[in-house]
């Protein structure tokens, strides 16, 4: 569907940045107001990331007004906040398709628009990418400007400071906009600071500053006194010291919702030499009261009615696997004060809210710093604590070296509760949990488990927690559990042992994880044997040998990349046992899985019951 653009008369004149730049500056506040209302109505219909975009409306308008995009390059960090950017860059009429199959990508995406200079989805990449572009722009020598936009949350990642340190050393021209939405606009972010920012970014101040540096270069004592005086004066009103020490000229903080001040400050900063930081203060959820009061709850939303001022409530039903994990975590912490749980800024998504409230001294949020989170767990384990790392599959990729070097190599008993394993859906290729079984399976000393239902998930978490001879991983999907009867008593599962769940003939289906239900449906129609393998590593070699010797064909099923996944492990095991048997591997293909509803993607990839049946029948034909 498309919106009645006549309700947004000024925004209608700014379908592209080129059109926006033709408008008089006096209309920019109205453009911002209409853009915010359009975003509100659009996301209410489509679902998607919400609160972040509401907070970056004025910033987006100012950036595209001052900078000659797409010639000048904007790099957005993560991309949750980039919906206003998409609306202003000739994608307004497609916004209702965002995150849907064949619709707009949920994040800035190079293949989608020339205005999207860098494809994103994970945090902390913008400054590094922008620095690369800035260096290239300097070599090109045609006056191209480069801007990175990063939020205060992403600034907790070490990669950002690595890039800032490098940029300050190289001294290429670039602007980093720090969008600080941790707190609401405070009194010191008003007329005085806006005026100060414009003054300090203006030609007079910067010329005096640079010329003074040249004059004082040969007089180090006086130069140091001048520097201290400048820092003292600036330090009274701005937290400049950290960025200045990294080699950046710091401007701010200024009101990120005052579009005129943003435009004037950016105009001044556009022509400054060297690396620049513009610190702006914004309010996440700006302009929609429920989102302002609860920006975390309104970070991403389903379809909703804006007039109701509340998110739609879901009917009580099956728990999610994240909730199953959260309950297990609380149950264990109640009996063992040595348990410590770590998350890299994913408390809500990982089901840890209750745990963090009931056991605050055992809860550690490492912020968006996956490398640190994994090695923090290693340190806990060395000291005799029992760490559990709750992490999304896609984010564990960012702590891979630490998993190998700091945990597995030392055979430390760290339990990894890996959420979002397999197809995630609407967030697309940056968030699909497609690779974890493949990249963990090759690591020595790892125990890897894939539960088929929520009860098995609890028992596996307990098994991993009790196992003290090295790291363990329990990998489970996003979404609702299967409805299996829960067994409250927790018992250890024998390491490396699978179970037969159906006896058939000719075809043996070897399943890993929650694809068991779909695989079982296919097995019923084929009169096939099916095994719930439970362990990806170590494999149940005895069960595999038995199945291979009594069946004509082996079929492996997993929601992971086929290359290097559990099925590859089965083939390797059969080869080692010198058993020659046809093997069909069913799983994710050798491509990045696009965005869409999980059931749509599953059907397209033939990972549902009908697709598994069709693949086996084609293989047997």
From Swiss-Prot:
User: Which cofactors?
Assistant: Mg(2+); thiamine diphosphate
Protein's UniProt name: 1-deoxy-D-xylulose-5-phosphate synthase
Q: In the Enzyme Commission scheme, what number(s) does this protein have?
A: 2.2.1.7
Assembly information from the UniProt record: Homodimer.
Taxonomically, the superkingdom here is Bacteria
Cofactor binding description: Binds 1 Mg(2+) ion per subunit.
Q: What is the lineage of its organism?
A: Bacteria, Pseudomonadati, Pseudomonadota, Gammaproteobacteria, Alteromonadales
- According to its UniProt entry, this protein's organism is Shewanella frigidimarina (strain NCIMB 400)
Q: Which InterPro entries match?
A: Dxylulose-5-P_synthase, THDP-binding, Transketo_C/PFOR_II, Transketolase-like_Pyr-bd, Transketolase_BS, Transketolase_C, Transketolase_CS
What the entry lists under SMART domains is as follows:
Transket_pyr
GO terms classed as biological process: 1-deoxy-D-xylulose 5-phosphate biosynthetic process; isopentenyl diphosphate biosynthetic process, methylerythritol 4-phosphate pathway; terpenoid biosynthetic process; thiamine biosynthetic process
Q: Which UniProt keywords apply?
A: Isoprene biosynthesis, Magnesium, Metal-binding, Thiamine biosynthesis, Thiamine pyrophosphate, Transferase
Gene Ontology MF terms in the entry: 1-deoxy-D-xylulose-5-phosphate synthase activity; magnesium ion binding; thiamine pyrophosphate binding
Chain sites annotated for binding Mg(2+) = 152, 181
Q: Where does thiamine diphosphate bind?
A: 80, 121-123, 153-154, 181, 288, 370
GO cellular component annotations, sorted alphabetically?
cytosol
What exactly does this protein do?
Catalyzes the acyloin condensation reaction between C atoms 2 and 3 of pyruvate and glyceraldehyde 3-phosphate to yield 1-deoxy-D-xylulose-5-phosphate (DXP).
Q: Note the Gene3D superfamilies from the entry.
A: 3.40.50.920, 3.40.50.970
Q: Which reaction does it catalyse?
A: D-glyceraldehyde 3-phosphate + pyruvate + H(+) = 1-deoxy-D-xylulose 5-phosphate + CO2
Q: Member of which family?
A: Belongs to the transketolase family. DXPS subfamily.
């Amino acid at each position: 569907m498309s919106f009645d653009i006549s309700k947004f008369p000024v925004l209608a004149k700014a379908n592209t940045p080129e059109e926006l730049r033709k408008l008089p500056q006096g209309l920019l506040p109205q453009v911002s107001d209409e853009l915010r209302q359009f975003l509100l109505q659009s996301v209410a219909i489509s679902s998607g990331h919400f609160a972040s975009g509401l907070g970056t409306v004025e910033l987006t308008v100012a950036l595209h007004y001052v900078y000659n995009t797409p010639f000048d390059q904007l790099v957005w960090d993560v991309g949750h906040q980039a919906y206003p950017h998409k609306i202003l860059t000739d994608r307004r009429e497609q916004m209702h398709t965002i995150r849907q199959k064949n619709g707009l990508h949920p994040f800035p995406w190079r293949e989608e628009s020339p205005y999207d200079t860098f494809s994103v989805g994970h945090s902390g990449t913008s400054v590094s990418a922008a620095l690369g572009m800035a260096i290239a722009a300097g070599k090109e020598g045609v006056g191209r400007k480069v801007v990175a936009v990063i939020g205060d949350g992403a600034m907790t990642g070490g990669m950002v400071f690595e890039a800032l340190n490098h940029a300050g050393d190289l001294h290429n021209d670039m602007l980093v906009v720090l969008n600080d939405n941790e707190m609401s606009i405070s009194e010191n972010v008003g007329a005085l600071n806006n005026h100060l920012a414009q003054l300090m970014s203006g030609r007079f101040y910067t010329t005096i500053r640079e010329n003074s540096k040249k004059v004082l270069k040969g007089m180090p004592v006086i130069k140091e006194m001048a520097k201290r005086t400048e820092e003292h004066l600036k330090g009274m009103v701005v937290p400049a010291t950290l960025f200045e020490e990294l080699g950046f000229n710091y401007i701010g903080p200024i009101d990120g919702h005052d579009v005129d001040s943003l435009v004037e400050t950016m105009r001044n900063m556009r022509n400054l030499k060297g690396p620049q930081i513009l610190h702006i203060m914004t309010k996440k959820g700006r302009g929609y009261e429920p989102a302002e009061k609860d920006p975390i709850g309104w970070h991403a939303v389903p379809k909703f009615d804006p007039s109701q001022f509340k998110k739609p409530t879901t009917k009580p039903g099956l728990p999610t696997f994240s909730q199953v994990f959260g309950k297990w975590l609380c149950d264990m912490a109640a009996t063992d004060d040595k348990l410590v749980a770590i998350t890299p800024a994913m408390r809500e998504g990982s089901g840890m809210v209750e745990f963090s409230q009931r056991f605050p001294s055992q809860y550690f949020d490492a912020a968006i710093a996956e490398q640190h989170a994994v090695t923090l767990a290693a340190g806990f384990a060395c000291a005799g604590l029992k760490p559990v790392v709750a992490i999304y599959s896609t984010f564990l990729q960012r702590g891979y070296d630490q998993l190998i070097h700091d945990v597995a190599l030392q055979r430390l008993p760290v339990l990894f509760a890996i959420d979002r394993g397999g197809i995630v859906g609407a967030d697309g290729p940056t968030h699909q949990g497609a690779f974890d079984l493949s990249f963990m399976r090759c690591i020595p000393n790892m125990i890897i488990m894939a539960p088929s239902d929520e009860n098995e998930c609890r028992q596996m978490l307990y098994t991993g927690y009790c196992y003290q001879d090295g790291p363990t991983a329990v990998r489970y999907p996003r979404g609702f559990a299967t409805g299996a009867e829960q067994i409250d008593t927790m018992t250890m599962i024998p390491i490396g042992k699978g179970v037969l769940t159906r006896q058939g003939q000719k075809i043996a289906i070897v399943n890993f994880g929650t694809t068991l239900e779909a695989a079982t449906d296919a097995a019923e129609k084929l009169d096939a044997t099916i095994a719930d393998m439970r362990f990806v590593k170590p494999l149940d070699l005895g069960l595999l040998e038995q199945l291979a010797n009594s069946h004509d064909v082996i079929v492996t099923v997993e929601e992971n990349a086929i290359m290097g996944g559990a099925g590859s492990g089965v083939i390797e095991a059969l080869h080692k046992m010198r058993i020659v048997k046809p093997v069909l591997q069913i799983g994710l293909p050798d491509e990045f899985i696009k965005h869409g509803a999980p059931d749509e993607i599953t059907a397209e990839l033939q990972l549902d019951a009908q697709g598994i049946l069709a693949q086996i029948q084609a293989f047997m034909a």
